[in-house]
């Protein structure tokens, strides 16, 4: 059963990415990337994780509203392509791992820069 769930999650991820790029015309969703999908064991719910290019809270709220508005259309279009009896209910959650990774990368670069400055002063 786990193999089937993983296959359906991959199929939903692939199809939602296509739908978001080709069929949804909401300008609020231009910078959104679907990063992962997790389905419940009975495939009744699918948690869709997304990331954005910005960390602006106002933009984040706009994107959440845009995804909520487009949820019905996305589910309908998914139903036309998925090979499951019932299309899962979509739940959108922000994937903060990309932003967290970017923040860690900036901190590492700052430390490297400070180390270089200290080395140059000691010479």
Swiss-Prot record:
Principal place of residence: cytoplasm
Coiled coil (residue ranges): none
Domain of life: Bacteria
InterPro entries: KH_dom-like_a/b, RbfA, RbfA_dom_sf, Ribosome-bd_factorA_CS
A Gene Ontology cellular-component term: cytosol
GO terms, biological process: maturation of SSU-rRNA
Compartment list: Cytoplasm
Keyword terms: Cytoplasm, Ribosome biogenesis
A GO term, aspect molecular function: ribosomal small subunit binding
Homology family: Belongs to the RbfA family.
Main function: One of several proteins that assist in the late maturation steps of the functional core of the 30S ribosomal subunit. Associates with free 30S ribosomal subunits (but not with 30S subunits that are part of 70S ribosomes or polysomes). Required for efficient processing of 16S rRNA. May interact with the 5'-terminal helix region of 16S rRNA.
NCBIfam families (alphabetical): PRK13818.1, rbfA
Subunit structure as annotated in this protein's UniProt entry: Monomer. Binds 30S ribosomal subunits, but not 50S ribosomal subunits or 70S ribosomes.
Name of this chain's protein: Ribosome-binding factor A
Organism, as annotated: Lactobacillus johnsonii (strain CNCM I-12250 / La1 / NCC 533)
């Amino acid at each position: 059963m786990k193999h089937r769930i993983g296959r359906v999650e991959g199929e939903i991820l692939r199809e939602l990415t296509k739908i978001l790029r080709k069929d949804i015309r909401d300008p609020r969703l231009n910078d959104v990337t679907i990063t992962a999908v997790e389905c419940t064991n009975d495939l009744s719910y699918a948690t869709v994780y997304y990331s954005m290019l910005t960390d602006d809270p106002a933009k984040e709220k706009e994107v959440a509203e845009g995804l909520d508005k487009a949820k019905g259309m996305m589910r309908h279009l998914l139903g036309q392509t998925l090979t499951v009896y019932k299309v899962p209910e979509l739940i959108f959650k922000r994937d903060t791992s990309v932003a967290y990774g970017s923040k860690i990368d900036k901190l590492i670069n700052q430390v490297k820069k400070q180390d270089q400055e200290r080395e140059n002063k000691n010479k």
